[in-house]
Amino acid sequence: MDNRPIGVMDSGLGGLSVVRVIQQKLPNEEVIFVGDQGHFPYGTKDQAEVRQLALSIGAFLLKHDVKMMVVACNTATAAALPALQAALPIPVIGVIEPGARAALAQDKKGPIGVIATTATTTAGAYPATIERLAPGTPVIAKATQPMVEIVEHGQTGTAKAQEVVSEQLMTFKEHPVKTLIMGCTHFPFLAPEISKAVGPTVALVDPAKETVATAKSWLEQHQAMGNHAHPNYHLYSTGNLPDLRAGVNKWLLSGHFDLGTAQIEEGD
């Protein structure tokens, strides 16, 4: 047993999709979450800058005595996962390989679609991972950066959201896929709009689910599961605290939430 919290980070509110799955699948675990809204978006930054920000957040989480770090951000996973794993004395889990594995479990032939930020798409993170896991599987990757802002600004469920999503996903009308990876943790909050745009026969893959399953497996293997009957969720924003509070109220399950601000700078 290990009652220390799980640390979770994202560039903004998207990581709450991972926290929500932790609430569902690991209900006795406490969480410390950092949404780096002060530096949002990561998806338009270069990899070196994202790496430094992620390392700073890792150091912040380590000071709060987390037992594990979940990088609930595809852009940060692509840019910083090996650096975080080398720098921190705790397990660090990203979202890209779990997402790729989940997609391949559903569709071994492809083509597999991927929607992600500009940075994740430019890095080629999903095609490279899928190629490593299942050589020769075709992948159609599309940068859909405007969809990230829709979620971050609380516009899910609106006509504006559907308009933006439908426009961004036109590629998959021309190049149909059976499986679509939501390769940004913001995108599960747009699942209804995405499904409407690509059609009900396309399976949507949320990497959060497989990522949390990976975390749970590690905790079980190392006898490190928590046993909090009523866990606390400590959520920090480096920017807009009211937006974080709105996201918590809209997307997370009920629980005891402590919200606050954190100062994160490159090289902290």
Curated annotation (Swiss-Prot):
Chain positions recorded as substrate binding sites: D10, S11, Y42, G43, N74, T75, T185, H186
Enzyme class, first EC level, given as a word: isomerase
Catalyses which reaction(s): L-glutamate = D-glutamate
Membrane-spanning segments: none
Keyword Disulfide bond: no
UniProt-listed Pfam families: Asp_Glu_race
Enzyme Commission number(s) from the entry: 5.1.1.3
Recorded consequence of changing C73A: Abolishes racemase activity
Highest taxon in the source lineage: Bacteria
GO molecular function: glutamate racemase activity
Keywords: Cell shape, Cell wall biogenesis/degradation, Isomerase, Peptidoglycan synthesis
Gene Ontology BP terms: cell wall organization; peptidoglycan biosynthetic process; regulation of cell shape
Catalytic residues of the enzyme: C73, C184
The protein's annotated pathway: Cell wall biogenesis; peptidoglycan biosynthesis
Role noted for this protein: Provides the (R)-glutamate required for cell wall biosynthesis.
Family matches, as HAMAP family: Glu_racemase
Family: Belongs to the aspartate/glutamate racemases family.
Quaternary structure and interacting proteins, as annotated: Monomer.
Name this polypeptide is given: Glutamate racemase
Species of the source: Limosilactobacillus fermentum (Lactobacillus fermentum)
